[in-house]
């Protein structure tokens, strides 16, 4: 592999979010902005959101998106339009999100994906052998999916900012009906009614799994976090650090995502309101 990290990673965990689903993405964006500092070091940021649909740009083309989101709001899901990745991913208390941030914009797309795939291969080796490549029929399917025994447990997406590179991924830790949720969501949103130019292929719930369901091992969020840190530290320099990012960068990032990129975000309560509607 043509890329390596010469500085220790700062390992940060900002915990579990339940308010606006945009908040953890704002923290990722603020950390990306912090890469402009001359003393910037690479960061691995962990977080959990309980629970929401993290939509991609392609989902905006669905004919009944508003009705589907309203129904999911009544079922306890918030939603957010995210800036990376192509289609919807369901997040809940059993999904671990991880962002890898580098003060480096010159790394190639493939090299960054390959590097993080190595991190995951080492970090999750106690749970079995990971396979990388598209899992056809899974939600948000793409060539940077990762799976165990052919069933998707997560996926990766990356982008560049002015000051660095950011790769975001999620890992299904415990067993919940995420594939069924996505089948239901796309049915409500009218995917099957679209005769041509479908923005998303059909979803097959059986293609999705989790660490717990596919390995038969006890897999709690705390256990997976601890094993990730322990095994990754065996191969790379990693320094656990309390989560911190400058308030000014958080404010700027909130404005950038919501006002400049027009990423909408709603809690379940907001989505469930009778008068709720998508922004024009």
Swiss-Prot record:
PROSITE patterns registered for this protein in UniProt: BPL_LPL_CATALYTIC
GO terms assigned for molecular function: lipoyl(octanoyl) transferase activity
Pfam families reported for this sequence: LplA-B_cat
Keyword Transferase attached: yes
Known pathway: Protein modification; protein lipoylation via endogenous pathway; protein N(6)-(lipoyl)lysine from octanoyl-[acyl-carrier-protein]
EC category name: transferase
UniProt keyword list: Acyltransferase, Transferase
UniProt catalytic activity: N(6)-octanoyl-L-lysyl-[glycine-cleavage complex H protein] + L-lysyl-[lipoyl-carrier protein] = N(6)-octanoyl-L-lysyl-[lipoyl-carrier protein] + L-lysyl-[glycine-cleavage complex H protein]
Residues annotated as site: Lowers pKa of active site Cys: 152
Residue span(s) of domain BPL/LPL catalytic: 38-240
Record EC number: 2.3.1.204
Example GO biological process: protein modification process
Keyword Ubl conjugation on entry: no
Active site, UniProt feature: 140 (acyl-thioester intermediate)
Domain of life: Bacteria
PANTHER family for this protein: OCTANOYL-[GCVH]:PROTEIN N-OCTANOYLTRANSFERASE, OCTANOYLTRANSFERASE LIPM-RELATED
Protein family per UniProt: Belongs to the octanoyltransferase LipL family.
Note: The reaction proceeds via a thioester-linked acyl-enzyme intermediate.
Function per UniProt: Catalyzes the amidotransfer (transamidation) of the octanoyl moiety from octanoyl-GcvH to the lipoyl domain of the E2 subunit of lipoate-dependent enzymes.
Name of this chain's protein: Octanoyl-[GcvH]:protein N-octanoyltransferase
Taxonomic lineage: Bacteria, Bacillati, Bacillota, Bacilli, Bacillales
Gene: lipL
């Amino acid at each position: 592999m043509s890329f390596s990290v010469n500085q220790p990673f700062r390992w940060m965990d900002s915990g579990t979010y339940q308010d606006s689903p945009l908040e953890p993405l704002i923290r990722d964006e603020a950390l990306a902005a912090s890469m402009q500092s001359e003393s910037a070091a690479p960061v691995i940021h962990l977080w959990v959101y309980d629970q929401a649909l993290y939509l991609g740009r392609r989902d905006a083309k669905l004919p009944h998106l508003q009705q589907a989101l309203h129904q999911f709001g009544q079922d306890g899901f918030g939603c957010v339009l995210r800036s990376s990745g192509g289609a919807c991913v369901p997040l809940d208390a059993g999904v671990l999100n991880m962002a890898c941030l580098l003060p480096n914009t010159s790394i190639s797309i493939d090299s960054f994906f390959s590097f993080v795939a190595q991190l995951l291969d080492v970090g999750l080796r106690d749970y079995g052998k990971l396979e990388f490549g598209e899992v056809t029929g899974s939600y948000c399917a793409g060539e940077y999916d990762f799976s165990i025994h052919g069933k998707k447990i997560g996926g990766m997406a990356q982008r560049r900012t002015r000051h660095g590179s950011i790769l975001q991924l999620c890992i299904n830790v415990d067993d919940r009906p995420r594939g069924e949720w996505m089948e239901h969501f796309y049915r409500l949103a009218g995917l099957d009614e679209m005769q041509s130019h479908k923005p998303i292929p059909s979803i097959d719930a059986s293609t999705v799994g989790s660490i717990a369901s596919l390995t038969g091992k006890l897999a709690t969020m705390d256990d997976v976090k601890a094993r990730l840190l322990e095994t990754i530290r065996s191969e790379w320099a990693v320094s656990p650090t309390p989560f911190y990012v400058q308030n000014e960068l958080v404010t700027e990032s909130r404005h950038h995502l919501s006002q400049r990129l027009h990423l909408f975000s709603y809690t379940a309560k907001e989505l469930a309101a009778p008068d709720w509607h998508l922004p024009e």
